Amino acid sequence: MAPKKAKRRAAEGSSNVFSMFDQTQIQEFKEAFTVIDQNRDGIIDKDDLRETFAAMGRLNVKNEELDAMIKEASGPINFTVFLTMFGEKLKGADPEDVIMGAFKVLDPDGKGSIKKSFLEELLTTQCDRFTPEEIKNMWAAFPPDVAGNVDYKNICYVITHGEDKEGE
């Protein structure tokens, strides 16, 4: 009887994480998982993380950083564990902090900006892809500076508050 209860509890635990998100969100997480799972074995490991960082232009990630990321999970990081980890991190999180955190991943040097070309490539090739019209509208609302950099703090503010910061 005990093994059946344990199996039922494990199934309930995994089904609870899927109830935290709607189907669209789950699909977006699945797409993100697939992008990170570089070797397509269904498990995110240290090599997958290293290759993902390299694809984003960050080539000097230390083993300690990667080990710390992997150790955040209780075991191998399959999709259910991945979704659970995000569910736990997002539960009670301020949406502005979450969005800012996502941008900071793309800005390992902490400059507060990212290259327009890099952001445009991500937005047109990954997950919920932007149309050319959406890209045009975004650059009209958030024009890059003369060096081709985009201030993501302002984008984050507008996403979460619906209007530009006054005085910026």
UniProtKB/Swiss-Prot annotation:
Q: Which GO terms of the cellular component aspect does the record hold?
A: cytoplasm; myosin complex
* Example GO molecular function: calcium ion binding
Chain sites annotated for binding Ca(2+) = D37, N39, D41, D48
Modified positions (Phosphoserine) are S15
Establish whether keyword Repeat is in the entry.
yes
- State the function annotated in the UniProt record: Myosin regulatory subunit that plays an essential to maintain muscle integrity during early development. Plays a role in muscle contraction.
General remark: This chain binds calcium.
Name the chain's protein.
Myosin regulatory light chain 11
| Native source species | Gallus gallus (Chicken)
